[in-house]
Amino acid sequence: MDLHLRGKRVLITGASKGIGAAAAEAFAEEGAHLLLAARSGDQLKALAERLRSAHQIDAATIVTDLRKPEDITRLVKEAADIDILVNNAGDIPGGSIDKIDEAAWRHAWELKVFGYINITRAI
C-alpha cells in the first residue's frame, strides 16, 4: 500500500519495542526516514540497524526520557523538520485502580500526559 510517506521524517517515541517498534516497521516499509526515541538504547540501535538494512531508509536513534525537560530539548534539536510525530512512550501501571499507589500514577502521568504535551509543544 502506498501511503505517500516516502522521504517523510517521522519521530517515534517509545520506539524500542511493542507498538512503537511496530509503527517504526510500518513507516519504514513505506519509505519514511525515522528518528527512534526511547530509554533503552541497545534495543533502539538494533531496531534501527534492522530497518536500515531491510528498507534502505535513514533511521537514527536517540536515548531519551520524556519526563526530563533536558531530554526533550535535546530530542527536539535532533528532530528538526519532522513531518510526523508518534507519541508512544511509556506504559501504564497494571492492576486494580484501588491497588495502584499514587506514586505509580504520577510516574505514568508525568510521561504519558505531560511528556507528550511538552514534546508536542516544543516541536
List each model region and its residues.
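The beta1-alpha1 cofactor-binding region of Rossmann-like NAD(H)/NADP(H)-dependent oxidoreductases
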Residues: 41-42, 62-74, 102
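Flexible N-terminal pre-Rossmann segment of NAD(P)-dependent oxidoreductases
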Residues: 1-9
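Conserved glycine-rich cofactor-binding loop
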Residues: 9, 16-17
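Conserved glycine-rich Rossmann-like NAD(P)H-binding loop of the short-chain dehydrogenase/reductase
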Residues: 30-47
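Substrate-binding pocket helix/loop in short-chain dehydrogenase/reductase
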Residues: 96-97, 104-109
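Conserved NAD(P)H cofactor-binding loop of Rossmann-fold oxidoreductase domains
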Residues: 89-93
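A short, exposed helix-loop element centered on a Lys and neighboring polar residues
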Residues: 120-121
